[in-house]
Structures are given as structure tokens and as C-alpha cells.
């Protein structure tokens, strides 16, 4: 059968792939392989819910289906569309330090260009215009979490959106995954022994029934060297937006 899924709605470069892989350790989770882009791409949305459910893996009656498309979080039309499919849906949102997320966002696009042997400007060229922070840079906008979350809160109460601390998930995955299990009403099946620290890679990998697997080598890539003064500008820029976000969700995060 193919029931409505729970959705990891974002954020891009927040740790959505890691979260989905970790959740997949649970026997009662059936995870969609690819980012479906149903609610944000018109050519998919126009094909209707039947098409969407067709992209989901088959699941048994006791299983929960999960899909992730990080672009959903920052796409203004998506919350209403998700709500019209299933107002009672449980949503997962994984966030990390907004400045770090911007650097990671740049790094991904930079490496995509490198692989295609295409030139790509330095991060400074995106972040600075006329000696000031370039607030028109899309990656900055994606890190204004309070702006995008407000859009979702017009359609869903906060208790329907579980916010995963992406920085903690990478440092110490098990406690964060336990919270996700509880939120999704899954039985506690994932254990601390499912995670082991890989010294070579510098982050946690997964152990699943004797099978070890690490996230794709694109994960944990080094960010570009950024001038400390520019980093400070980034931190200053996000200071107020972060405060607004903390007020919105009633909790704080250990961000710059």
C-alpha cells in the first residue's frame, strides 16, 4: 500500500539526507529514495496526488513512509498544498547554524561546478556587494528560518512540525533520533549501537544489522576558507533573525 507520507521539509544543507538515512534504520520506516519535488515543481504537482503516491515506496500496514525534499521549506506555495493533502501530517524540519548552512550551500554548488570543470566565483563574490553583505544572495535568504517557518505556521500548528537540531544530529545522533521516533509515534527501535564514529571521515556512520554504511562522500566536505571579518558579518547579519526564530519556536539553539 502507499499511504500519505510524513515529510522532511528542509532545510537545504541542513542534514536532511543524514536524517533520512538514520530514520531508515527503523524497521517501521519506508523511505522514498529520491527527492520527489511534488509540491514545489508545477510539472509534478499538476499530475496530481496519484502521481505523488506513485513515487513512494511500497509499505506494509504498520510502516510509516517518509520523503524528503528540502526545497519545500523555503517555497512559499508548498505549506498550503501539503495541508490540502493532509492537515494532520507530521513534518520534520532539520536546521543548523545559519552561517554554516550558507557556507555549505555555496560549497555544494561550487563542487558541482568543479565536477563539470566549470569555473565558479569565490564565496566572497556572492556574499559581498559594494563592501556590504549582499542580502540578495539566495543562500542567505534560505537561512532566514523565521521567515519561512512563519509561512508554514499559517497552515500547521507548531506541534505538527518537529525541529531537529542538525548540529547535534551530526555530533551525537542518537538522542536526536530518539526524539524523532517519539514525534513520529514509532516504537523505540534505533539504538546507540547503530551509530559509530568514523575517525577517517570525522563523523558518525551507521551500523545496520552488521552492515556498516557511511553517508555519501559529498557529506562533510571542507568549506572554503572565508575571511574572519566576513564570517563576523555573517554572524551579525543572522543575530536578529535567529532571535526572532527562537521566540517563534520557544527554544534556543547553539548558533553563532
List the model feature ranges, each with a label.
Residues 37-39, 69-73, 138-139, 166-170, ...:
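Short histidine/acidic/glycine/proline-rich micro-motifs that form metal-
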Residues 1-73, 85, 89, 99-129:
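PAPS-dependent sulfotransferase catalytic core
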Residues 15-16, 52, 66, 82, ...:
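Generic structural signal for small/hydrophobic residues in well-ordered secondary structure
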Residues 46-49, 75-76, 146, 228:
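Structural motif corresponding to alpha-helix initiation and N-cap regions
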Residues 49-53, 79, 149-150, 242:
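Generic structural signal for well-ordered alpha-helices
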Residues 150-243, 250-256:
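The conserved 3'-phosphoadenosine-5'-phosphosulfate
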Residues 77-80, 84, 88-93, 100-184, ...:
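PAPS-dependent sulfotransferase catalytic domain
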Residues 10-12, 22-23, 180-184, 244-246:
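Marks the mature luminal ectodomains of secretory-pathway proteins
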Amino acid at each position: 500500500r502507499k499511504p500519505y507520507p510524513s515529510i522532511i521539509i528542509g532545510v537545504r544543507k541542513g542534514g536532511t539526507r543524514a536524517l533520512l538515512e538514520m530514520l531508515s534504520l527503523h524497521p517501521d520506516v519506508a523511505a522514498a529514495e529520491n527527492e520527489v519535488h511534488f509540491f514545489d515543481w508545477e510539472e509534478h504537482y499538476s499530475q496530481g496526488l496519484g502521481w505523488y503516491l506513485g513515487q513512494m515506496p511500497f509499505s506494509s500496514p504498520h510502516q510509516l513512509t517518509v520523503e524528503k525534499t528540502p526545497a519545500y521549506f523555503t517555497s512559499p506555495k508548498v505549506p498550503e498544498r501539503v495541508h490540502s493533502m493532509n492537515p494532520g501530517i507530521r513534518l520534520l524540519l532539520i536546521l543548523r547554524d545559519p552561517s554554516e548552512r550558507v557556507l555549505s550551500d555555496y560549497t555544494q554548488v561550487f563542487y558541482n561546478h568543479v565536477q563539470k570543470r566549470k569555473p565558479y566565483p569565490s564565496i566572497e563574490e556572492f556574499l559581498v556587494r559594494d563592501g556590504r553583505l549582499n542580502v540578495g544572495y539566495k543562500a542567505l535568504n534560505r537561512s532566514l528560518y523565521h521567515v519561512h517557518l512563519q509561512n508554514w505556521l499559517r497552515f500547521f500548528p507548531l506541534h505538527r512540525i518537529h525541529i531537529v537540531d542538525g548540529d547535534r544530529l551530526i555530533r551525537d545522533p542518537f538522542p536526536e533520533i530518539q526524539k524523532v521516533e517519539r514525534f513520529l509515534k514509532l516504537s523505540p527501535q534505533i539504538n546507540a549501537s547503530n551509530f559509530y564514529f568514523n575517525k577517517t571521515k570525522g563523523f558518525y556512520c551507521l551500523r545496520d544489522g552488521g552492515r556498516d554504511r557511511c553517508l555519501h562522500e559529498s557529506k562533510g566536505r571542507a568549506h572554503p576558507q572565508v575571511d574572519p571579518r566576513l564570517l563576523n558579518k555573517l554572524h551579525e547579519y543572522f543575530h536578529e533573525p535567529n532571535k526572532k526564530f527562537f521566540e517563534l519556536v520557544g527554544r534556543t539553539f547553539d548558533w553563532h
